[in-house]
Amino acid sequence: MGYHNVKYGKKAQRRNYSKTIYDVDLPNLIEIQNQSFDWFLKHGIKELLQDFCPIESYNGDLKIHFDDYFLAPPKYSIEETKIKDISYVAQLFVKTTLENVLTGETKQSNILLTELPLMTPTGTFVINGTERVVVSQIVRSASVYFAGNFDSKLNRTTYSGQVIPSRGAWIEYEEGSKEILYAKLDRSKKIPLSNFIYALGFDSKEAIENVFGKSAIIDSVFDKETDMDSDNALVELYSKIRQGEKVPVDTARDFIRTRLFDQKKYDLAKVGRYKFNKKLDVLTRAENTYLACDFVNPETQEIIIAQDELLTKEKIAILKQNRHFLLQEIFDAKHNLENETDEEILAYKKDPQKNELFTKTNIINSRTGEVLVAKDTLVNDDIINHLRHNIHTLDEKVSKFFLGTKDIYQKEADRQGVFNEILEVYTSKDESGKLYHKVKLIGNDQRETKKHITLSDVIASINYYLNLYENVGTVDDIDHLGNRRLRLIGELLKNQFRIGLTRAEKNIKDMISTSKFSEVNGPGDLVNFTFLMSVIKTFFTSSRLSQFMDQINPLAELTQKRRVSALGIGGINRDRAGIEVRDVHNSHYGRLCPIETPEGPSIGLITSLSTYAKVNKYGFIQTPFFKVLHQDGKTTLSRHIDYLTADQEKEEIIASAGFVLDANNAFKDKKIIARSNGETGIFERSQITYADVSPKQIVSVATSSIPFLEHNDASRALMGANMQRQAVPLLIPESPIVGTGVEYRAAKDSGCLIIARESGFVTYVDAQKIIITKKPNQNVSLNGKTLYDTTQEFTYAQAKALYENNYKEHQAEYTLINFAKSNQDTLVLQKPIVVLGEQINEGDILVSGPSTSQGELALGRNVTVAFMTWEGYNYEDAIIMSEELVKHDVYTSIHIDKYEVQTRELKKGSGQEEITREVPNVGADAIKNLDERGIIIPGSEVKEGDILVGKITPQGNIEPSPSEKLIQIVIGEKAREYKDSSLRVPFGEGGIVQSVHYFSRKNGDVLPAGVNENIRVFIAKKRKINEGDKMAGRHGNKGVISRILPKEDLPYMADGTPIDIMLNPLGVPSRMNIGQILEIHLGMAAKKLGIKVATPVFDGVNDYDLKEIMKEANLDPDGKMVLYDGRTGEPYDSRISVGVMYMVKLSHMVDDKLHARNVGPYTLVTQQPMGGKVQNGGQRFGEMEVWALYAYGAAHTLQEILTVKSDDIVGRNKTYSAIVQGTPLPKPSIPESFRVFIKELQSLGLYVELIKTDTKENEVNKSLIDYKKEGYN
């Protein structure tokens, strides 16, 4: 038997045809959103506040410390924020201390940092009443990158390098003309690499050769330099960065030090330090080279690895254990560019063992010459405060050293030398076995944890760059996922907070520098975080990564939360992105879906996470693999799972998911298909180190819901994955007969269902709420009667007793959503799928929502399909449908439109707008459905033009027309004072009024300035499927309904069953999506057997399984049958493929698009009719349509279309008059667009005239007023 029955949740069961022995459950599909936001709340804010703490006044007298932070509870619930059109936020407070440094006094208060939008449990944000999703951004990781390009002129490869931080100055290396190597700092002009090396602190070529070694490449770098030293090089480097500005060497040194080694200006972040240490590790380069000298333990003189030995992986492992012996000091603390020079250091240690600093010289008042602090005085807090008190009289060097941002004792602790790991190796061996080509490898200090770059890193990066010319080291693939990482919501928010706090810091510094401690009540008087609030608001409302949630169905919602975008700030520009960055990369395997991506200009730039993908703490995407064990000559699969990044996967040989195991989990086949370093090949089973956990781990959730995916062309699979996200929720949803097994988890994790938080029994259920009574932790008794005893099993009777006696602490209440409007104007309705008394386990699904059925994804319906033509009506993928599907609401959907009206305060003396039933100049019939306030009654049926809310607006002092005067005399004074400004049903709309929301300033509702009342009316309309609606299968097979036929005209089977849908058979071979053919055969068999099946992607029903199930269902082996013409009763000549296909109705509906224009607006400049349904625009008659009329020689029609029907202002008015008066149509005049063209030529200095032969006048310059004078009308 090639299948097993599997339960999906408590309500659904499928016959699963998966061949995989281990069914690894999918991880939580939206954890990347929730976990990242939780990290930001717990750690991200804390790290930021530490970076900005303390903020000092310019003279150092006052300091502001951020001690701690806390979130106040949200004022409104998630549901309330959606109703009131406000954001779901919590106030973020920071505990702030204002310190007077001179006296030690402090003042404390809690200050509002910002209103922080909170993430809902389903991974979304509610901003101004609408749900939004922040998508993850994929960017290049901070690291050291090297690239190589073959130069045909030089006939060799030239190299370039980039040292990229998360924030700060880049260092770049490149080869220029004349084979000279250059360096650039912070995108400045380039300087020779030799000068850049000198600038690091080297004073001579000999000193450089001592570190970098003697080699041809070093000689080529330094052969043109003679009198350069460290000081001159620093001044030159400063000059290049500052566009030629010349300064003393101390200023240049200080500038470079600040640019590179100050954490406020330069930030690698954790990921940058991890990648720097990984790339610049000397041992990574040393693999497969030969040791140039003995590697000795200097303490014991023991030879750990002998000279000339090949450095294999095992030898490298030994070196790693003893890597501290590789360290060599390049510069001592005194000559380290990161540290201050001897001249700048004004304190010293008398005793190296004690942590005490003494002044080097007398510290003098520069104005009076008075000695403020004597030489050899111990520097303590009192001395520092004394100096701070006299800061304005101190020399600049003194104040900078003693009163700088960093404590002098901390500076002393950080003052260290520069250490690098150095190893000399041979790279080549001749035929006689003699080693040659000696190379010196320099790595950075692997003990380093600093978040900024160090001199050790810079020296190692230069050496790596030079090593590339000696064929040591590797170039980087920037599209590899080891070099690209995700910025999740937590990091994106942290970056925005940093921008806001940086702006606020300057403002706070200015405030505390101009304030006195005694005159302020607390830090709240000095601190203003308006900048931060503005930045956060802008990010959530207008960032490219903050998107209006695609709420059309659960799959669309889930996919958007797992979406990965390369666009946005710090990302890729869509217009400049090449094919390489968009293309599928072998490192995407199990991490990014190779199928699901948009079809337009964003193709490849917006992708989706694969099903099992997770994101590690550095932002790199991981995918799971089973560990493979080798014991007793057997290769077995363990149940242990490791999550590997793309970099870690490089080192492994990973078996593809189609492997075969015996009863003991040992691999049966000696040769196994596996991947190594991104390439697929055949390997011995003894070489295998890991194995795929599932065949579907390569694709995303949307793609894995396509059955028989492996039989479809990739571009059609892409369309199928994308179109499922456009499926409209149907009135009666139905899960697919042919599924893939992911439908349950996709629906559960999407966020549109209610999941039980705890186990228990259902003690109350209706359409509004579900109450689950859970098991108490202790005995419960009431009036001497035991309601629950912990020694007994918890039963429904006990749960019912607890519920009836109102024990709220043992109840969990779940509120259902009833007739809500989604972001895409579709209906959101939750219905219970549990019954009273049912036992519930934690994690069970309690309701079915939009596009779900029994807890499974249900985007469409299972319909009987025949691949045949019918009178040519399914030409070009068109679909022919049975009228029965319309009658029985198979593809009917409900849509809700929102209409809004406000009453506003008018300018002083003009009165105010009113909501009223007394609307002037309308009959009783127009207001019959309004309540006493003048608002439509819910449940009323309305059509185009009907009043929804009666509203009147004061007219002001405008003289009424004679007819209005007559009405005023008859009706009264009110008609004169007010005009009708009621909210009416727009053109082409209508339906049933579903609900009305009324907000008023009097009731305490929050409304925008100047608004007194706000009324929202929601109208629901039922849309049956119609000709012109777009439908699709799951295999990229899409089409528009061309005909809806009566039941009696449709082809029928031998038993009289009519066909539901007819599809064009020509739509299959050219599109190469054979999956749909397999689906109809399997669907027909499953329907006959009364079962549902799961055929997972790459691992489902094969030919043998399909034959067997068709045989079981008594179907013909070819899946074809004789159909009869419904009109004649005659059988068709050929047997026809008939089966059951799952088809969805897409959101592209004809009701939204069908449109006709009678009268409407014109564009201002060209005076041509506006376009589109929203503007009540016309149908564009474009260039190609004009060609068609040329071809037919329809001159009069063409002249009409180009003039009086378009932008001939004079002609169209004359034509209107002629039609009204019944006179012949006049000749057209000049179109307005021609006048615009002439004006554009005039703006270029070309004077164009169009002289009329009879009047000799220039027609182009005539205005509409001139024509009116001539009396054209």
UniProtKB/Swiss-Prot annotation:
<dbReference type="InterPro" id="IPR007121">
    <property type="entry name" value="RNA_pol_bsu_CS"/>
</dbReference>
<keyword id="KW-0804">Transcription</keyword>
<dbReference type="InterPro" id="IPR014724">
    <property type="entry name" value="RNA_pol_RPB2_OB-fold"/>
</dbReference>
<comment type="similarity">
    <text>Belongs to the RNA polymerase beta chain family.</text>
</comment>
<dbReference type="InterPro" id="IPR042107">
    <property type="entry name" value="DNA-dir_RNA_pol_bsu_ext_1_sf"/>
</dbReference>
<dbReference type="GO" id="GO:0000428">
    <property type="term" value="C:DNA-directed RNA polymerase complex"/>
</dbReference>
<dbReference type="InterPro" id="IPR007641">
    <property type="entry name" value="RNA_pol_Rpb2_7"/>
</dbReference>
<dbReference type="InterPro" id="IPR037033">
    <property type="entry name" value="DNA-dir_RNAP_su2_hyb_sf"/>
</dbReference>
<dbReference type="GO" id="GO:0003899">
    <property type="term" value="F:DNA-directed RNA polymerase activity"/>
</dbReference>
<dbReference type="InterPro" id="IPR007645">
    <property type="entry name" value="RNA_pol_Rpb2_3"/>
</dbReference>
<dbReference type="InterPro" id="IPR007644">
    <property type="entry name" value="RNA_pol_bsu_protrusion"/>
</dbReference>
<dbReference type="GO" id="GO:0003677">
    <property type="term" value="F:DNA binding"/>
</dbReference>
<protein>
    <recommendedName>
        <fullName>DNA-directed RNA polymerase subunit beta</fullName>
        <ecNumber>2.7.7.6</ecNumber>
    </recommendedName>
</protein>
<comment type="subunit">
    <text>The RNAP catalytic core consists of 2 alpha, 1 beta, 1 beta' and 1 omega subunit. When a sigma factor is associated with the core the holoenzyme is formed, which can initiate transcription.</text>
</comment>
<dbReference type="GO" id="GO:0006351">
    <property type="term" value="P:DNA-templated transcription"/>
</dbReference>
<dbReference type="InterPro" id="IPR015712">
    <property type="entry name" value="DNA-dir_RNA_pol_su2"/>
</dbReference>
<dbReference type="Pfam" id="PF04565">
    <property type="entry name" value="RNA_pol_Rpb2_3"/>
</dbReference>
<dbReference type="Pfam" id="PF10385">
    <property type="entry name" value="RNA_pol_Rpb2_45"/>
</dbReference>
<dbReference type="InterPro" id="IPR010243">
    <property type="entry name" value="RNA_pol_bsu_bac"/>
</dbReference>
<keyword id="KW-0240">DNA-directed RNA polymerase</keyword>
<dbReference type="InterPro" id="IPR007642">
    <property type="entry name" value="RNA_pol_Rpb2_2"/>
</dbReference>
<dbReference type="GO" id="GO:0032549">
    <property type="term" value="F:ribonucleoside binding"/>
</dbReference>
<comment type="function">
    <text>DNA-dependent RNA polymerase catalyzes the transcription of DNA into RNA using the four ribonucleoside triphosphates as substrates.</text>
</comment>
<keyword id="KW-0808">Transferase</keyword>
<dbReference type="InterPro" id="IPR037034">
    <property type="entry name" value="RNA_pol_Rpb2_2_sf"/>
</dbReference>
<dbReference type="InterPro" id="IPR019462">
    <property type="entry name" value="DNA-dir_RNA_pol_bsu_external_1"/>
</dbReference>
<dbReference type="Pfam" id="PF04561">
    <property type="entry name" value="RNA_pol_Rpb2_2"/>
</dbReference>
<dbReference type="Pfam" id="PF00562">
    <property type="entry name" value="RNA_pol_Rpb2_6"/>
</dbReference>
<keyword id="KW-0548">Nucleotidyltransferase</keyword>
<dbReference type="InterPro" id="IPR007120">
    <property type="entry name" value="DNA-dir_RNAP_su2_dom"/>
</dbReference>
<dbReference type="Pfam" id="PF04563">
    <property type="entry name" value="RNA_pol_Rpb2_1"/>
</dbReference>
<dbReference type="Pfam" id="PF04560">
    <property type="entry name" value="RNA_pol_Rpb2_7"/>
</dbReference>
